[in-house]
Amino acid sequence: MKPYAIIQTGNKQYQVSEGDVIDVELLDGVSEGQEVVFEQVLFTFDGSKASLGTPTVSNAVVKGEMLSRVRGEKVIAYKYKRRKNYHRKTGHRQNYLRVKISNLVM
Protein backbone atom coordinates (compact mmCIF):
# COMPACT_ATOMS: atom_id res chain seq x y z
CA MET A 1 0.00 0.00 0.00
CA LYS A 2 1.12 3.53 -0.66
CA PRO A 3 1.51 6.03 2.19
CA TYR A 4 -1.55 7.99 3.23
CA ALA A 5 -2.81 10.22 6.02
CA ILE A 6 -6.17 11.17 7.50
CA ILE A 7 -6.54 14.91 8.01
CA GLN A 8 -9.26 17.05 9.54
CA THR A 9 -10.31 20.42 8.15
CA GLY A 10 -13.63 22.21 8.19
CA ASN A 11 -14.89 19.70 10.78
CA LYS A 12 -14.60 16.92 8.16
CA GLN A 13 -12.04 14.15 7.75
CA TYR A 14 -10.29 13.22 4.50
CA GLN A 15 -8.03 10.30 3.61
CA VAL A 16 -5.28 11.68 1.38
CA SER A 17 -2.10 10.54 -0.31
CA GLU A 18 0.36 12.37 -2.58
CA GLY A 19 -1.20 13.52 -5.85
CA ASP A 20 -4.82 13.41 -4.62
CA VAL A 21 -7.16 16.28 -5.46
CA ILE A 22 -9.77 17.04 -2.77
CA ASP A 23 -12.45 19.67 -2.24
CA VAL A 24 -12.35 21.20 1.26
CA GLU A 25 -14.33 23.92 3.01
CA LEU A 26 -13.18 27.49 2.34
CA LEU A 27 -10.04 28.58 4.17
CA ASP A 28 -9.36 32.24 4.98
CA GLY A 29 -6.50 34.06 3.31
CA VAL A 30 -5.68 31.45 0.65
CA SER A 31 -5.27 32.49 -2.98
CA GLU A 32 -4.85 30.44 -6.14
CA GLY A 33 -1.49 28.69 -6.46
CA GLN A 34 -0.65 29.25 -2.79
CA GLU A 35 0.55 26.45 -0.52
CA VAL A 36 -1.95 25.09 2.00
CA VAL A 37 -0.74 23.35 5.17
CA PHE A 38 -2.97 20.94 7.11
CA GLU A 39 -1.63 20.44 10.63
CA GLN A 40 -4.49 18.40 12.08
CA VAL A 41 -3.26 14.97 11.02
CA LEU A 42 -5.19 12.24 12.84
CA PHE A 43 -3.55 9.14 11.35
CA THR A 44 -0.55 8.32 9.15
CA PHE A 45 0.57 5.19 7.33
CA ASP A 46 3.99 5.21 5.64
CA GLY A 47 3.71 1.86 3.87
CA SER A 48 4.85 -0.29 6.78
CA LYS A 49 4.11 1.53 10.04
CA ALA A 50 0.89 3.20 11.19
CA SER A 51 0.70 6.09 13.66
CA LEU A 52 -2.51 6.96 15.44
CA GLY A 53 -2.74 10.40 17.02
CA THR A 54 -4.21 11.24 20.41
CA PRO A 55 -5.88 13.36 19.02
CA THR A 56 -3.26 14.38 16.41
CA VAL A 57 0.03 12.89 15.28
CA SER A 58 2.91 15.08 16.48
CA ASN A 59 5.26 16.50 13.82
CA ALA A 60 3.01 15.27 10.98
CA VAL A 61 1.97 17.79 8.34
CA VAL A 62 0.19 17.48 5.00
CA LYS A 63 1.02 20.10 2.38
CA GLY A 64 -0.94 20.92 -0.72
CA GLU A 65 -1.46 23.55 -3.39
CA MET A 66 -4.72 25.39 -3.95
CA LEU A 67 -5.89 24.86 -7.52
CA SER A 68 -9.16 26.81 -7.66
CA ARG A 69 -12.40 27.75 -5.98
CA VAL A 70 -15.33 25.53 -6.95
CA ARG A 71 -19.01 25.37 -6.10
CA GLY A 72 -20.79 22.23 -5.03
CA GLU A 73 -24.02 20.77 -6.35
CA LYS A 74 -27.17 22.77 -5.74
CA VAL A 75 -29.21 21.57 -2.76
CA ILE A 76 -32.93 22.31 -3.01
CA ALA A 77 -35.09 22.99 0.06
CA TYR A 78 -38.81 22.88 -0.71
CA LYS A 79 -41.57 23.58 1.81
CA TYR A 80 -45.30 23.53 1.28
CA LYS A 81 -48.55 23.34 3.19
CA ARG A 82 -51.29 21.32 1.60
CA ARG A 83 -54.50 23.08 0.61
CA LYS A 84 -53.13 26.50 1.69
CA ASN A 85 -51.42 27.63 -1.55
CA TYR A 86 -48.11 27.89 0.36
CA HIS A 87 -44.95 26.91 -1.55
CA ARG A 88 -41.36 27.98 -0.83
CA LYS A 89 -38.39 26.78 -2.86
CA THR A 90 -34.84 27.83 -2.02
CA GLY A 91 -31.49 26.60 -3.27
CA HIS A 92 -27.98 26.61 -1.87
CA ARG A 93 -24.56 25.99 -3.42
CA GLN A 94 -21.61 25.56 -1.06
CA ASN A 95 -18.23 27.08 -1.97
CA TYR A 96 -15.15 24.82 -1.78
CA LEU A 97 -11.40 24.99 -2.36
CA ARG A 98 -9.90 22.42 -4.72
CA VAL A 99 -6.53 21.36 -3.27
CA LYS A 100 -3.90 19.04 -4.76
CA ILE A 101 -1.93 17.18 -2.08
CA SER A 102 1.78 17.59 -2.79
CA ASN A 103 3.62 16.28 0.26
CA LEU A 104 3.06 14.11 3.35
CA VAL A 105 5.52 14.85 6.16
CA MET A 106 5.35 12.07 8.76
Curated annotation (Swiss-Prot):
SUPFAM superfamilies: L21p-like
Entry GO CC: cytoplasm; ribonucleoprotein complex; ribosome
Keywords: Ribonucleoprotein, Ribosomal protein, RNA-binding, rRNA-binding
Molecular function (Gene Ontology), one example: structural constituent of ribosome
Keyword Amino-acid biosynthesis (UniProt): no
InterPro entries in the cross-refs: bL21-like, bL21-like_sf, Ribosomal_bL21, Ribosomal_bL21_CS
Listed PROSITE patterns: RIBOSOMAL_L21
Assembly notes: Part of the 50S ribosomal subunit. Contacts protein L20.
Record-linked HAMAP family: Ribosomal_bL21
Family the UniProt entry places it in: Belongs to the bacterial ribosomal protein bL21 family.
Function: This protein binds to 23S rRNA in the presence of protein L20.
Protein known as: Large ribosomal subunit protein bL21
